[in-house]
Amino acid sequence: MSPPVVNELAPNSVLVFSGKGGVGKSTIAANIALGLTLRGRDVGLLDVDIHGPNLPKILGVEDKHLSVDEHNKIHPVMVIPKLRLISIAYMLPDPSTPIIWRGPMKHNAIRQLLEQVDWGKLDWLIIDSPPGTGDEPLSVAQLLPATSAIVVTTPQELSLLDCRKAVNFAKRLNLKLLGVIENMSTLICPHCGKPIDIFRRGGGTRISTEMGIPLLGSIPMDIKIVEASDYGKPFVIEYPDSPATQAIMNVVDKMLQLEVPPPPKKE
């Protein structure tokens, strides 16, 4: 298998995935990517959630379009300066059109996106995968063997059960686990600003200790995150003082401590 060209363009690639749905994985992936741009990095965001591609909606770029040049290279959508997005959503005639594909078709589509896209210069590639340990994360792991992984969970035990499967999946495929993110750790009261434990707090810490992986951070719930996603606003940019933004930026800073520098330019 020939190495995808993106390996040469993104010294840091990270698969963001989860064991189950509904944990806010796409929102986390989008805001990590935004946070990296706030730290001056050039970032690509690849949406391989083939059956539920939501990143264009979350980032407010649903109405934009991909372009293809004379060399048959796909050019991503520019979300903001330094952030480029590729999503299968841009290839659908209508947002409500379902994709009914089996595994080999999904693998080939992901391979095409990895090899045919002209990202330009990238420092980081953030890959948003669907929940579970199925075809899409497996394809990414096979096509980008140098990819690292972040597992997103919520505090309740049902989510933690599936989180353990996701961690073991990454270990079986020799993906470097950057760590786990506990999303929705608490709810920030919109009236008094105090945290409310609507789920059991500390699930991320338990997984971190039990599985021997770092806890990258615990992200509190904030009603503004929902509003930002619904209206396509970049949350960490629009609400820099939110405790959730501060928690996300702490995760970003931990990722940057592990950053691989770009290779030296060839003479």
Predicted features and spans:
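Extreme N-terminal, non-catalytic leader segments
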Residues: 1-23, 37, 64, 249-252, ...
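Amphipathic alpha-helical transducer elements in NTP-driven molecular machines
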Residues: 7, 52, 103-111, 134, ...
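Walker A/P-loop phosphate-binding motif and the immediately C-terminal alpha-helix
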Residues: 12-47, 167
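Phosphate-binding loop that captures ATP/GTP phosphates
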Residues: 42-44, 48-92, 107, 205
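Glycine-rich phosphate-binding loops of nucleotide-dependent enzymes
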Residues: 86, 110, 129, 142, ...
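Phosphate-binding/switch loop-helix module in NTP-utilizing enzymes
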Residues: 91-140
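Conserved catalytic-core segment of NTP-binding enzymes
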Residues: 123-124, 130-228
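C-terminal boundary of histidine-terminating zinc-finger modules
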Residues: 231-244
